[in-house]
Amino acid sequence: MDKRTLPSRLAAAGATLASLVAPSGAQAELKPGDTAPVFTAPAALGGKTFEFSLAKALGRGPVVVYFYPKAFTKGCTIEANRFAEAQDEYQALHATVIGVSGDDIDTLKKFSVEECRNRFAVASDADGSIMKAYGAVMPLLSSYAKRVSYVVGTDGRIAYAYSSLSPDEHVPNTLAALREMAKR
């Protein structure tokens, strides 16, 4: 191999890898102050299906919209259990919690009972439109959501955003954000 072509080949390989890691059309996550995209979606609570409406939920108070990759996987189960355990705290802050994933509604009916413990709803975003609108599509796996939590204020704007693959801090961080909002 000619030594002069090695740098250009490495540059081409790097560009190819970069295009795979950051697919075109990927959107950035929303930031505080951004308008939250309004959505309706099929959802499940306690094994029963209904149509969740962000606009209607915001009429009752702030909404925690949390995205998770896949029902019944280890991290997503841990996160759902933690949101379920904290529901009394969310309710005391007049907040609604809705989990969103690309899972089908039949899977979420079961997940809403077994892991969400009948305490909060989970919505199906099978076509990925909600994940895309919120910048929550997982790179390379577009049918999966990134683990991102948003607190949406009653004004329809993102009040808080937190992104971490770990499920550990989503509940405490969103509760802290809601407590700060309640002080205002």
Language-model region placement:
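N-proximal helix/coil linker or "cap" segments that precede and/or mark the start of modular domains
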Residues: 10, 17-43
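A short beta-strand-turn-helix
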Residues: 40-62
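Short active-site neighborhood of thiol/selenol oxidoreductases, capturing the structured segment around
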Residues: 54-81
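Structural micro-motif
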Residues: 118-120, 138-150
